[in-house]
């Protein structure tokens, strides 16, 4: 293992959510799993790593939807035509393939390269209808998206207008290539791995912007896709972090930043403005939570922690 490969501390909104919800889960998620991919580690560490790589059916649904939307937008921005029906069939086919892979249990010996579901790992009795409803949620979400103002707006955009398009298609070679074999740059999404974070008082802050584009007047729209079943207000901190990123990395003035959240499952849209006050509040929240997170470290310099209890 490379000496440079270290578990360095960084901040993200999802990390904060885990920290606030359960300290034990936080430890497993960000510390207990480390080195679990190595051969000469205790079985407990390997098992923590294995569990970290698994998805539950709800996060799986969200990942599928995000990937599919990214591919739809990528295709549209490159003027590639996709058959609506064939695309949905291909997405369902991918879900079935991943489901079968999980059912095989291959993730138990190689969790890094094999998809796995927690429901299968724990041998939960999930009704067939539940899985079918999950599939229906995905299809409905894609239909809602293609009927949304965001899809219509993208039809008037060029690739140059797109500032960020998040969606990891690299692990999905077969499905995406089969859908559109002529999409020559299908894996080159405009989001750059080099700028998916910014530094705040020396702390790395990770950001994952689903979609962002710039208007002719220089204003920027940053959009977060949601796929949950519950309706409600979006996470204001998440959206404000997008705004913070835009000011720091793209040098966009606060007054030109427009934040949007769209729940494709519920066809529900929310919009927020960004401001200097909002940026300052976000800054203070991040730094305060960083301080709280580091209080549980046994070695702050090495970013090491021990399991409580």
Question: Could you tell me what each predicted segment is?
Answer:
Residues 16-32, 41-77, 92, 96, ...:
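Nuclease catalytic cores
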Residues 37-41, 176-241, 246:
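Non-catalytic protein-protein interaction segments used by genome-maintenance enzymes to assemble
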Residues 53-61, 126, 130, 199, ...:
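Conserved aromatic-histidine-acidic binding/catalytic patches
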């Amino acid at each position: 293992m490379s000496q440079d490969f270290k578990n360095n501390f960084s901040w993200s909104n999802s990390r904060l959510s885990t920290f606030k919800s359960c300290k034990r889960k936080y430890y497993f998620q960000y510390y207990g799993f480390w080195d679990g991919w190595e051969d000469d580690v205790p079985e407990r560490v390997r098992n923590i790593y294995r569990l970290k790589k698994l998805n539950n059916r709800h996060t799986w649904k969200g990942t599928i939807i995000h990937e599919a939307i990214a591919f739809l937008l990528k295709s549209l921005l490159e003027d590639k035509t996709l058959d609506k029906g064939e695309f949905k069939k291909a997405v369902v086919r991918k879900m079935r393939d991943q489901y079968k892979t999980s059912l095989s249990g291959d993730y138990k010996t190689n969790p890094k390269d094999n998809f796995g579901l927690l429901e299968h790992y724990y041998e939960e009795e999930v009704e067939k209808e539940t899985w079918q409803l999950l599939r229906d949620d995905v299809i409905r979400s894609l239909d809602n998206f293609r009927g949304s103002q965001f899809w219509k707006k993208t039809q008037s955009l060029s690739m140059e207008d797109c500032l960020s398009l998040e969606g990891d298609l690299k692990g999905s070679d077969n499905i995406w290539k089969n859908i559109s074999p002529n999409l020559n740059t299908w894996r080159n999404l405009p989001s750059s791995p080099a700028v998916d974070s910014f530094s705040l008082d020396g702390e790395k802050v990770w950001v994952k912007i689903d979609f962002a584009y710039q208007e002719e007047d220089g204003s920027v729209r940053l959009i977060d896709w949601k796929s949950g079943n519950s309706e409600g207000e979006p996470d204001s901190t998440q959206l404000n972090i997008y705004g913070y990123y835009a000011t720091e990395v793209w040098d966009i003035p606060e007054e030109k930043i427009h934040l949007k959240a769209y729940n494709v499952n519920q066809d529900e849209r929310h919009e927020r403005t960004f401001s200097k006050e909002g940026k300052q509040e976000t800054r203070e929240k991040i730094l305060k939570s960083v301080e709280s997170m580091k209080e549980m470290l046994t070695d702050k310099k090495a970013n090491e922690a021990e399991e409580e209890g």
